[in-house]
């Protein structure tokens, strides 16, 4: 290039000094997630975690999971509320491996952002650290990737990765599910982290850029209390963090509860997740009467579904419908498992039952 001139990394938009300040800002919150197996601290080329504790298991099976938060982040950016999306990230990963009965051991995060600002980054990572503490796993590493010229300064995306362990004899397996089994549900906090592409259409945030007057006006609108939500605002209801079910479920399983398998209800709703926990010759019959489910649905899900004029089947394959986690148990164990869950502070309810079939989810009002 004949007209070339000296250009630094900072000239290109990457502020390594601010990146260093961001690392300093999160060091203590990361350290606070440590388990005894963690070796060293952040800053190395890899996160170190001792496997010595696995020697007490008969046949330890490592289970990994990775996921993101999706377009819920668009709403967080418009509202300038970043403290809880990290919990969403952790939940999406650890709840997935919990479905096999695995205990999450450690977690890593990846943040892609247009411009790193230490205070902003600390808010995001605080949510990740809080989620790790709720799940009992260590945050052993991560990456902050600044993407100047590719992403707008305030834009960011999150991805996470977790590794857990379960002893093979205790691993949950859909093959254990039989006709007659009962499906129990644990409540969600709301929409959790799936269905936000539809939510964005309903609340009219598509095309609005964070930090603009349009974003400020929309944030004010979404902060108004709504009677349909019991006085809560759409912003509060839609940004409620995804529940992390790890500690009560692991305590339940360690107590010997005879759970056949578990389904984490995420993208695709009940219809496209509960089937993943079924044996090939079993169907799940979910209790429903038209638009009414057999349990209480969070008002925000009902509100969005009505605004979008979703048919019941469409709603059930878009949203969790108030069910964050399903546990499948034998009918003779339903009362004992329910009692144990209540003792752990949970509020279980019956979602449906299993019948002979071909691995599908069907609804009672369509049989």
Describe every region a protein language model picked out.
Residues 2-11, 120, 124-131, 135-138, ...:
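Glycine-/charge-enriched secondary-structure boundary and capping motifs
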Residues 2-37:
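N-terminal amphipathic/basic leader segments beginning at the initiator methionine
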Residues 26, 48, 93-94, 199-202, ...:
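Buried hydrophobic packing segments
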Residues 66, 157, 170-230, 234, ...:
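Short, acidic (Asp/Glu-rich) active-site segment that either coordinates a divalent metal cofactor
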């Amino acid at each position: 290039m004949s007209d070339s001139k000296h250009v630094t990394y900072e000239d290109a938009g990457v502020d390594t000094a601010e990146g260093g300040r961001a690392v300093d800002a999160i060091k203590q919150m990361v350290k606070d997630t440590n388990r005894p197996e963690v070796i060293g601290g952040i800053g190395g080329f890899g996160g170190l975690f001792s496997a010595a504790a696995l020697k007490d298991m008969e046949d330890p099976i490592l289970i990994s999971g990775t996921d993101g938060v999706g377009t819920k982040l668009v709403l967080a950016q418009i509202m300038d509320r970043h403290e809880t999306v990290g919990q969403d990230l952790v939940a999406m990963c650890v709840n997935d491996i919990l479905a096999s009965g695995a205990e999450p051991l450690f977690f890593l995060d990846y943040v892609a952002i247009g411009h790193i600002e230490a205070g902003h980054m600390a808010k995001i990572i605080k949510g990740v650290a809080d989620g790790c503490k709720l799940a009992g796993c260590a945050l052993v590493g991560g990456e902050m990737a600044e993407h100047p010229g590719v992403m707008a300064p305030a834009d960011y995306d999150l991805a996470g990765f977790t590794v857990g362990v379960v002893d093979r004899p205790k691993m949950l397996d859909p093959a254990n599910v039989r006709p007659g089994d009962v499906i129990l549900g644990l409540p969600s906090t709301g929409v959790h982290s799936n269905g936000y592409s539809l939510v964005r259409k309903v609340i009219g945030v598509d095309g609005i850029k964070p930090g603009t007057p349009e974003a400020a006006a929309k944030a004010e609108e979404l902060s108004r209390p709504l009677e349909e939500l019991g006085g809560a605002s759409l912003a509060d209801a839609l940004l409620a963090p995804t529940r992390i079910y790890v500690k009560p479920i692991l305590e339940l399983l360690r107590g010997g509860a005879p759970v056949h398998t578990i389904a984490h209800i995420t993208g695709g709703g009940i219809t496209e997740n509960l089937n993943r926990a079924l044996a090939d010759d079993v169907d799940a019959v979910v209790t429903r009467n038209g638009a009414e489910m057999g349990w209480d649905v969070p008002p925000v899900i009902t509100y969005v579904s009505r605004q979008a004029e979703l048919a019941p089947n469409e709603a059930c394959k878009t949203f969790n419908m108030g069910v964050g986690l399903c546990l499948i148990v034998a009918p003779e164990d339903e009362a004992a498992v329910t009692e144990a869950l209540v003792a752990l502070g949970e509020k279980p309810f019956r979602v449906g039952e299993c019948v002979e079939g071909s691995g599908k989810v069907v609804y009672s009002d369509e049989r």
